[in-house]
């Protein structure tokens, strides 16, 4: 079983009460000698642009902004920032940089903005007042610090090694307003991100902000609350709230209730809920759809179900060996101009089926046949007068396993559980991976007018990959050993290729690439022409790949077997490897795994190992 390992986050916060430090005296002078060494040396087959070093060991954060202009490395007590040439911009100790002497920071995280961003620090003090501070990443100057905000994380949280993965349950950054919502016991406070100034406070909204939508035209925010897991005792009397707020002064324009409980994913801690605005209506996706009037918050219609699809196995975090949950088992709603299609879950028989509802009134227009034996129904598509349904497929699994880890890989499990410790001991270690379960797998085509079954494929024995749909005419899909092409209008199978003849192992995923479909497999890649299914190439040079990324015009594969983290750059025209980078350290983006970060255009990879940073060019 392949896995994607993610070090659980150590994150951090902010507060109010603006203050300014005597920056010139407190900031360590950036050392000129730490300029990036130009290279030309090869990393795999990639070219190293430069190598440089942070002024600290970068045990907490080691990341780069979207275009590679700023490279940030932090430990518990200090930060070091390099420019795109690998030269030091600034270095400093938090205690000297902050007026409130924020020091050992249990949680730290970055928020990137165009041309810079913020570094947030949270110093949880078990016997004193918690301290928060915000630094300007471009200069190292303190923007503000505060001791006004308490109980943003549980008391006694331990400082753990980890990666920069986002914000706390009690703090939500609102990018459109460059501001933060900070949840306290009796109120929510909106804070200016640059100055720490309190803009407004309301006691009519309680809990954390699970999801929000900002209406720039009216300067209004619609947001939904949830109960922070680790701080639940602070939010007694909690109730579900969906509110519209005047972003200027915090006035509550309307307050509605909703059905269901917002859960957080086991490892990522993302809220499992979505919000969309369609015309004058707000659509909430939480165990089905709930639809509200945007003007007054009144519920108009709903189509919901009882959801236990996340599942749970193993034991509790206390005394057990593993806890596991499944996600992304049901497709999100599919919207058209006048209708919405929803994958529904049968209450008693656990069947799955599709409903079509009128977007305006919610009237049920049709319900498809009920499918038994399928654990998941992860994707639906509208192509012409057909609704294409993927029955079966891969699911996302998130796990916490009680394992022995070294001090360098003892990721911040305390952020989730409060447990964790030193090197060479057992800790709760997080994993995220895609997995195929034994279930019914097939392609199902429904008539859009009636919901009746137009055609279905034969049952796939092994598994079913996601679909590639080409020019609204053809559908391509794999089942592990075979690769198929279907005519969408009629369901005619116009080719059936023996993928196992490519000698690259079972199909795991499919990639849409120009006039080809590239099949990512257990031992390598195979590509097939869309026109006739003929094989273009097959390469088994890369084994154990369990994930792929399309970044800009570049494609990357990832291998995480045996606690490794290797990123391969791939030329999809011929399947050849451009180069590879194997992580030898911590930090990096959680998206790409320990020790690795990649720019938004996919042109550069940054590799981190303690103090050392290497910038690598993808295309020579």
Language-model regions: role of each:
Residues 22-620:
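Secretory-pathway ectodomains
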Residues 1-7:
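Bacterial N-terminal signal peptides that target proteins for export
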Residues 17-21:
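Sec/Tat signal peptide C-region and signal peptidase I cleavage site
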Residues 7-16:
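Bacterial N-terminal signal peptides
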């Amino acid at each position: 079983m392949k896995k994607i390992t993610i070090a659980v986050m150590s994150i951090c916060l902010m507060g109010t009460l603006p203050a300014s430090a005597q920056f010139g005296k407190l900031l360590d002078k950036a050392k000129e000698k730490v300029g990036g060494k130009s290279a030309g040396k090869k990393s795999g087959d990639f070219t190293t642009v430069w190598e440089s070093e942070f002024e600290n060991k970068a045990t907490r954060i080691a990341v780069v902004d979207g275009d590679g202009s700023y490279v940030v490395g932090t430990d518990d007590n200090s930060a070091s920032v390099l420019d795109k040439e690998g030269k030091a911009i600034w270095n400093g100790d938090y205690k000297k940089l902050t007026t409130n002497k924020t020091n050992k920071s249990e949680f730290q995280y970055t928020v990137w903005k165009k041309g810079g961003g913020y570094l947030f620090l949270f110093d949880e003090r078990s016997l004193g007042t918690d301290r928060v501070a915000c630094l300007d990443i471009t200069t190292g100057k303190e923007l503000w610090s505060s001791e006004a905000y308490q109980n943003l994380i549980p008391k006694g949280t331990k400082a753990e090694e980890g990666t920069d993965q986002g914000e706390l349950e009690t703090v939500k950054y609102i990018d459109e307003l460059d501001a933060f919502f900070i949840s306290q016991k009796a109120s929510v406070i909106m804070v200016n991100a640059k100055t720490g100034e309190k803009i407004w406070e309301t006691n009519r909204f309680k809990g954390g902000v699970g999801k929000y939508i900002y209406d720039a035209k009216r300067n209004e925010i619609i947001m939904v609350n949830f109960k922070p897991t680790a701080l639940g005792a602070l939010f007694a009397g909690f109730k579900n709230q969906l509110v519209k707020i005047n972003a200027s002064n915090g006035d509550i324009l309307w307050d509605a209730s909703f059905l269901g409980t917002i859960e957080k994913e086991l490892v990522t801690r993302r809220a499992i809920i979505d919000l969309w605005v369609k015309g004058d209506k707000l659509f909430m996706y939480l165990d089905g759809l709930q639809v509200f009037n945007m003007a007054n918050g009144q519920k108009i219609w709903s189509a919901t179900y009882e959801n236990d699809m996340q599942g749970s196995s193993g034991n509790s975090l206390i005394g057990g060996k593993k806890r596991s949950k499944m996600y992304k088992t049901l497709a999100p709603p599919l919207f058209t101009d006048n209708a919405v299609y929803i994958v529904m879950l049968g209450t008693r028989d656990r069947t799955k089926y599709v409903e079509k509802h009128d977007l305006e009134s919610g009237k049920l227009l049709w319900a498809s046949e009920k499918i038994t034996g399928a654990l998941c129904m992860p994707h639906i598509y509208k192509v012409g007068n057909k609704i294409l349904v993927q029955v079966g497929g891969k699911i996302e699994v998130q796990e916490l396993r009680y394992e022995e880890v070294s001090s360098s890989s003892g990721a911040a499990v305390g952020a989730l559980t409060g447990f964790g410790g030193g090197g060479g001991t057992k800790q709760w270690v997080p994993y995220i991976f895609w997995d195929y379960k034994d279930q019914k797998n097939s392609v199902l085509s429904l008539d859009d007018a009636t919901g009746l079954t137009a055609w279905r494929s034969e049952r796939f024995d092994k598994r079913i990959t996601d679909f590639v749909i080409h020019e609204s005419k053809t559908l391509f899909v794999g089942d592990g050993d075979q690769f198929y092409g279907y005519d969408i209008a009629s369901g005619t199978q116009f080719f059936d290729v023996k993928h196992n003849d490519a000698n690259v192992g079972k199909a795991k995923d499919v990639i849409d690439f120009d006039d080809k479909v590239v099949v990512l497999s257990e031992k390598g890649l195979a590509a097939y022409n869309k026109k006739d299914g003929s094989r273009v190439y097959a390469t088994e040079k890369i084994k154990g790949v369990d994930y792929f990324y399309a970044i800009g015009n570049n494609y990357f594969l990832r291998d995480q077997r045996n606690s490794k983290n290797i990123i391969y750059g791939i030329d999809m025209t011929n399947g050849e490897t451009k180069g590879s980078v194997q992580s030898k350290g911590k930090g990096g983006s959680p998206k790409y795994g320990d020790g690795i970060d990649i720019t938004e255009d996919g042109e550069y990879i940054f590799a981190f190992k303690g103090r050392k940073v290497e910038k690598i060019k993808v295309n020579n």
